[in-house]
Amino acid sequence: MVRQSGSELSDQSDTDISADSDTSASEGSARHSARGRHRDSRQKGDSSSRGQFLERVVRINRVAKVVKGGRKFSFSALVVVGDGDGTVGVGYGKAREVPLAISKGIESARKNFFTVPRVASTIPHPVQGEAASGVVLLRPAAPGTGVIAGGPVRAVLECAGVRDVLSKSLGSSNSINVVYATLDALKHLEDPASVARRRGLDYYHVVPKRIVRAVNSVGASSDTA
């Protein structure tokens, strides 16, 4: 039987420990890189899905329910979602956490999509919408005017793809009422082509003349450039 000295045993144990540590380190780095790849792919997927629609969180409200053991908090989120090209919807989500409430609001908004009639980058005619005590007036504007509106109204119009419009809030300043009043106004818009067919008129007799002139002047300037 061959006896090994204490120094030889310690050298062998040190070698085994270093090999085990190298193996565990390599496995840990592999797991870390795999998690990193998974996280990167997940982030890329989220960014591509967000790129298809515009999402605006108008309001987040915290609600406290008093129970025997204390208070339970929950959150509600009012979210506007649209493609920026004539389609928009509004949703309301409730949950115990803010991100979950926002995601529920987004899903609810996508179920309530509707199409907004437009002429170039504005609305075809003046319109007024009401919801509870909220009243919102919208007027068409010439190209280049921009969205002249407050926060809740602006969120709805930008998601709907209306880039030139004048607005005025005449009633309640509550953001929920203002958003739904804006939606009511957009739902009362009529497509100029269908109105022209119904009245037996030409399309350009239905659209406001100043909007037609502004659109034609913008088109002529772009052709010249």
Curated annotation (Swiss-Prot):
Stretches with biased composition (Basic residues): 32-41
GO BP annotation list: translation
Ranges for region Disordered: 1-50
PROSITE patterns: RIBOSOMAL_S5 (PS00585), S5_DSRBD (PS50881)
GO molecular function: rRNA binding; structural constituent of ribosome
Gene3D superfamilies on file: 3.30.160.20, 3.30.230.10
InterPro entries assigned to the protein according to its UniProt record, in alphabetical order: Ribosomal_Su5_D2-typ_SF, Ribosomal_uS5, Ribosomal_uS5_bac-type, Ribosomal_uS5_C, Ribosomal_uS5_N, Ribosomal_uS5_N_CS, Ribsml_uS5_D2-typ_fold_subgr
GO cellular component: small ribosomal subunit
Keywords: Ribonucleoprotein, Ribosomal protein, RNA-binding, rRNA-binding
Span of domain S5 DRBM: 53-116
Description of its domains: The N-terminal domain interacts with the head of the 30S subunit; the C-terminal domain interacts with the body and contacts protein S4. The interaction surface between S4 and S5 is involved in control of translational fidelity.
Function: With S4 and S12 plays an important role in translational accuracy.
Quaternary organization: Part of the 30S ribosomal subunit. Contacts proteins S4 and S8.
Family, as annotated: Belongs to the universal ribosomal protein uS5 family.
Protein name (Swiss-Prot/TrEMBL): Small ribosomal subunit protein uS5
Taxon lineage: Bacteria, Bacillati, Actinomycetota, Actinomycetes, Micrococcales
